[in-house]
Amino acid sequence: MVGTSPWLGSATTTVATQIIPIALIFSNGVTLDGTTKVGSTVASPLFQPFASQTGFTQYGDAVSRASFYSIVQQASPNWHVLLSQPAVFPTHNITVPAEEGFEFTGSASGAPIGLVNSDWFSHELRNLLAGLNLDPHTLPIFLTHNSFLFAGSPQDCCVIGFHSALASPGPGGSQNVNTFIWASYSDHGIFGKAIEDVTALSHEVAEWYHDPLTRNLVPAWPQPGSSACFSNILEVGDALENFRDLSFVVNMGEVQYHPQDVALFSWFARQWPSMGLKGRYSYRGSKLARPAPTC
């Protein structure tokens, strides 16, 4: 997890953050440019404080405090993990070969949509990250617009974000590990579920807070509504991603944002009662009534 232990008392950890906009140039001449959504992303509750259920703070900090809220109340009322106001990097242009992706107009939304092969895009992204030589103590966020990934075939769509880690040689024979996020800012109406604006990025931010290296093992768990094991990783967003009302509204001035609801730590740990906010197993409290079942 990111930050200090809430059991050790109040402390504030602030993580330097970068946004790297990506413009995807498709073979039909259309460009979908994440640069156009940088301002909206920076103004969102991912970076700006709002009146959350655990205090006036950013989204990632709010859900982290909610996971350990009984401990926070007792031992660390001023415990926080915050993202810095992000440094915005120059836009990186990526030309998508016709065999690796395409752009079209959504039939319901009327929005321009790009679909890209996930293996190809992941390779491009890792090469870009390796070339930036970023401090491994920072969090780079690669931002696209209305561009989603498919696995092998466009019918196997859509990945709208992921977080991962990339190892590289460090000084003196050491090894650096850069964690990073890619997410796509999506227009209203593209998805039938409540996925728009920063939903994808909020999902990945919450998961990065809890499991930045994607190796934080927990007992295997099923997604709600299924008995099949889905994962044994602490992926707080994946646990709720099949709910139609997976996001909630946060008003920032006159603009509405839709960050995702997430599962809290006690759900994965099978704790009863939950040490989460108000004894909950999810941040908003309405989706998970009890700990994760065995599978």
Regions found by a protein language model. Name each.
Residues 22, 43-46, 55, 65, ...:
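A general marker of short, structured functional hotspots
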Residues 154-191, 195, 212-295:
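Metalloprotease/metallohydrolase-associated module, dominated by Zn2+-dependent proteases
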Residues 24, 45-48, 102, 160, ...:
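Short non-domain terminal segments
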Residues 35, 99-112:
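Long, folded non-catalytic interaction modules
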Residues 106-216:
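Active-site-proximal segment of zinc-dependent metalloprotease catalytic domains
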Residues 1-97:
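N-terminal carbohydrate-binding/catalytic regions of secreted carbohydrate-active enzymes
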